[in-house]
């Protein structure tokens, strides 16, 4: 053994060839934390000191290669002064450079996922051989930063600036065949041939058949582009990427600027450019929010995994109520491998559900994400039925009938008598109390809520609602099924609106107040879209459905009359009474035309102004900042109340629910992280400025206490 640490070992393989293996003890994956970086330095020193070494193969003892840096260390590291961040990155790069500068050839054997620092380690090697099942990429832009271990320097010098910009700015994982095509790897082999492939390359390099020094040289030099080529490549890319990323996500464009600035430098000077740009991005609020989001997501996955121990295996599912929603649920279950019965009392509803599932599967085939054979397999896994004949072996039933408590209670009581005693019943409801629905059941311990968001195939969140009598097994089984469907489940306790809708309706309440104060709804939409929402509140209401919003508003007002009940008519009342129901009937706040692709396109319709005129009670002058605060303060305060009331267990789950469920701007991190970014004391003072707007704007006593004590939601 040439070197042995807790993360890295170096041992002889054969005839002067050694294996530098990453295998971080006590972890399921390899990652570049402080320990691993320090051991890499020591391992490289040990190799350099051993005259018998003729070549190095870099490998992994895990199923993955290296997943990247240890993101948990970013939180503290990024609080350091910018100059210290630059120094830290340059120190790390000295280690990578020392490996790259070894006087012997090096080959990276990529067995699994190699992301971020993992790929940057591979780029420092002379050759890369990749398993057909592996994936590589530089996803740092998704964290609001860009590669900091040489990725912006080595990758463009290996695969060309255009390809490198595409890889770095998109941040996606790349398949082996795509990596080979652009020259990011030198060979692709079957998983069982990976070591043999690496040995073949290293032996050919040792023998002189391959000139490893010539292969290494371009990574040490400036980019081979003249001034005109640079201008065309970089200026065009910056314009395109800026349009794609938008103004709230600076990292992709900053990565291009770094590559451009370093284009005329050799490796060492280019790495200084990279380190300076990386440190600048690391200090932004966008990076802080996106890293927080990543850590929240990891926390969600850990919590969901904890349910696996007691969850029952779902081998056969069923959905009650076909149509668009039922068809979407059936599609999601079938395409992820769980056969599902789709029951309705009407043949036309069954056909609608099958058409929806077939359309979604066909779209995946068209995009190359599914083979025709897999599409047929998924369609065969959806069994339509008008009766309960095959329900005896169903493990979970998702009830997705009309949003009416009496109808739901009747359907749930009926199906309970048709399934086995331990089958789970789950109601896909957005507003109706799970405890209320449970009263109709003989086995309420087997009953939970399972709230899907529309459209089911696109929205990642599922709220699993625990009722007073829901058993841990029922909750765990539903969480496991949601995960199996490819969703991100969050367990919440029962209350009107649960988490997401309870928080969303105060946001709509702020919007209603603005419209009643004479503020143009088109202006409100533009301001909130600029703030970062995927669509403004008026457009969102149209997409959700004015009738749905009207019903939900009434449910929330009944549940929380002290702050959500408003005796005055609102914009939603006016539209609902005028049968302007949104996209579903072609007119709401906006009117809707069909574009060339058959999708609804919103257009301004002046007739809506006459509809809204009776509910405008004043003409108040407000700034764009006021608009944001009228909307965001009640949303944030309701999120605080959900956490305080125990509706959601952690701040991480609350924030992720809003990001996944209603498109809360990811670069702002979620409602509670947004409060943190302002400062809790500052947010309380801000809310107090709008106290005259009503109880939705009044901070809780506990939040005031947090402000007084200088506390945060995330430390």
Curated annotation (Swiss-Prot):
InterPro entries: 3-OHacyl-CoA_DH_CS (IPR006180), 3-OHacyl-CoA_DH_NAD-bd (IPR006176), 3HC_DH_C (IPR006108), 6-PGluconate_DH-like_C_sf (IPR008927), ClpP/crotonase-like_dom_sf (IPR029045), Enoyl-CoA_hyd/isom_CS (IPR018376), Enoyl-CoA_hydra/iso (IPR001753), FA_oxidation_alpha_subunit (IPR050136). Residues 312-715 are annotated as: 3-hydroxyacyl-CoA dehydrogenase. Residues 1-190 are annotated as: Enoyl-CoA hydratase/isomerase. Keywords: Fatty acid metabolism, Isomerase, Lipid degradation, Lipid metabolism, Lyase, Multifunctional enzyme, NAD, Oxidoreductase. Pathway: Lipid metabolism; fatty acid beta-oxidation. The record marks 120, 140 as: Important for catalytic activity. Its EC number is 4.2.1.17, 5.1.2.3, 5.3.3.8, 1.1.1.35. The keyword Cell inner membrane does not apply. One of its GO terms (cellular component) is fatty acid beta-oxidation multienzyme complex. NAD(+) binds at residues 325, 344, 401-403, 408, 430, 454. One of its GO terms (molecular function) is delta(3)-delta(2)-enoyl-CoA isomerase activity. The active site is at residue 451. It catalyses: a (3S)-3-hydroxyacyl-CoA + NAD(+) = a 3-oxoacyl-CoA + NADH + H(+); a (3S)-3-hydroxyacyl-CoA = a (2E)-enoyl-CoA + H2O; a 4-saturated-(3S)-3-hydroxyacyl-CoA = a (3E)-enoyl-CoA + H2O; (3S)-3-hydroxybutanoyl-CoA = (3R)-3-hydroxybutanoyl-CoA. One of its GO terms (biological process) is fatty acid beta-oxidation. Substrate binds at residues 297, 501, 660. Involved in the aerobic and anaerobic degradation of long-chain fatty acids via beta-oxidation cycle. Catalyzes the formation of 3-oxoacyl-CoA from enoyl-CoA via L-3-hydroxyacyl-CoA. It can also use D-3-hydroxyacyl-CoA and cis-3-enoyl-CoA as substrate. In the N-terminal section; belongs to the enoyl-CoA hydratase/isomerase family. In the C-terminal section; belongs to the 3-hydroxyacyl-CoA dehydrogenase family. Heterotetramer of two alpha chains (FadB) and two beta chains (FadA). This is Fatty acid oxidation complex subunit alpha.
């Amino acid at each position: 053994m040439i070197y042995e640490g807790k993360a890295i070992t170096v041992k002889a393989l054969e005839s002067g060839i050694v294996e530098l293996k990453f295998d971080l003890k006590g972890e399921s994956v390899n990652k570049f934390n402080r320990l691993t970086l320090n051991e890499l330095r020591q391992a490289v020193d040990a190799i350099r000191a051993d005259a018998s070494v003729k070549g190095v193969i870099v490998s992994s003892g895990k199923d993955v290669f290296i997943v990247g840096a240890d993101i948990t260390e970013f939180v503290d590291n990024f609080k350091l002064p910018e100059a210290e961040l630059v120094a830290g990155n340059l120190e790390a790069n000295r280690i990578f450079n020392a490996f790259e500068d070894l006087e012997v050839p090096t080959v990276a054997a990529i067995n699994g996922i190699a992301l971020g620092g993992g790929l940057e380690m591979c780029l420092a090697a002379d050759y890369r051989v990749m398993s057909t099942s592996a994936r590589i990429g530089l996803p740092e832009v998704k964290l609001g930063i860009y590669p900091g271990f040489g990725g912006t320097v080595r990758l463009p010098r290996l695969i060309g600036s255009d390809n490198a910009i595409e890889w770095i700015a998109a941040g996606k994982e790349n398949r082996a065949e795509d990596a080979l095509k652009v020259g990011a790897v030198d060979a692709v082999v079957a998983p069982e041939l990976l070591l043999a492939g690496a040995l073949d390359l290293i032996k050919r390099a040792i023998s002189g058949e391959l000139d490893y020094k010539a292969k290494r040289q371009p990574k040490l030099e400036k980019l081979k582009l003249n001034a005109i080529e640079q201008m065309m490549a970089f200026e065009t890319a910056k314009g395109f990427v800026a349009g794609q990323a938008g103004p709230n996500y600076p990292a992709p464009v900053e990565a291009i600027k770094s590559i451009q600035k370093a284009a005329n430098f050799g490796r060492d000077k280019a790495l200084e450019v990279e380190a300076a740009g990386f440190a600048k991005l690391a200090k932004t609020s966008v990076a802080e929010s996106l890293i927080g989001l990543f850590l929240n997501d990891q926390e969600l996955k850990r919590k969901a995994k904890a349910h696996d121990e007691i969850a029952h295996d779902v081998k056969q599912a069923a959905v009650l109520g076909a149509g668009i929603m039922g068809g979407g649920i059936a599609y999601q279950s079938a395409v992820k491998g769980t056969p599902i019965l789709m029951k309705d009392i009407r043949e036309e509803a069954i056909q609608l559900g099958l058409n929806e599932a077939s359309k979604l599967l066909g779209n995946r085939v068209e995009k190359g994400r599914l083979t025709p054979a897999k599409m047929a397999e998924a369609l065969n896994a959806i069994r339509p039925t008008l009766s309960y004949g095959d329900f005896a072996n169903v493990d979970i039933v998702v009830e997705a009938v009309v949003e009416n408590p009496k109808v739901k209670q009747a359907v749930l009581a009926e199906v309970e008598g048709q399934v086995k005693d331990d089958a789970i019943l789950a109601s896909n409801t957005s507003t109706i109390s799970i405890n209320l629905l449970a009263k109709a059941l003989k086995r309420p311990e087997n009953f939970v809520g399972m709230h899907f968001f529309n459209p089911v195939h696109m929205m990642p969140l599922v709220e699993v609602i625990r009722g007073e009598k829901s058993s841990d097994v029922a909750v765990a089984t539903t969480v496991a099924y949601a995960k199996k469907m490819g969703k991100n489940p969050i367990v919440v306790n029962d209350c009107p609106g649960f988490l997401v809708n309870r928080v969303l309706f105060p946001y709509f309440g702020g919007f209603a107040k603005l419209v009643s104060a004479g503020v143009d709804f088109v202006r409100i939409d533009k301001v909130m879209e600029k703030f970062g929402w995927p669509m403004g509140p008026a457009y969102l209401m149209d997409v959700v459905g004015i009738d749905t919003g009207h019903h939900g508003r009434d449910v929330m007002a009944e549940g929380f009359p002290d702050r959500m009940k408003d005796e005055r008519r609102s914009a939603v009342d006016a539209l609902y009474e005028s049968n302007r129901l949104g996209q579903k009937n072609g007119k709401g706040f906006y009117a809707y035309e069909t574009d060339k692709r058959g999708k609804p396109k919103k257009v301004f319709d002046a007739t809506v102004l006459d509809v809204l005129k009776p509910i405008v009670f004043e003409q108040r002058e407000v700034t764009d900042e006021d608009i944001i605060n009228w909307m965001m303060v009640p949303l944030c305060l309701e999120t605080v109340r959900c956490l305080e009331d125990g509706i959601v267990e952690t701040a991480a789950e609350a924030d992720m629910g809003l990001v996944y469920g209603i498109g809360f701007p990811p670069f702002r991190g979620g409602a509670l992280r947004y409060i943190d970014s302002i400062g809790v004391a500052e947010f309380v003072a801000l809310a107090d400025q709008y106290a005259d707007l009503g109880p939705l704007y009044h901070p809780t006593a506990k939040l005031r206490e947090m402000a007084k004590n200088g506390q945060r939601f995330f430390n």
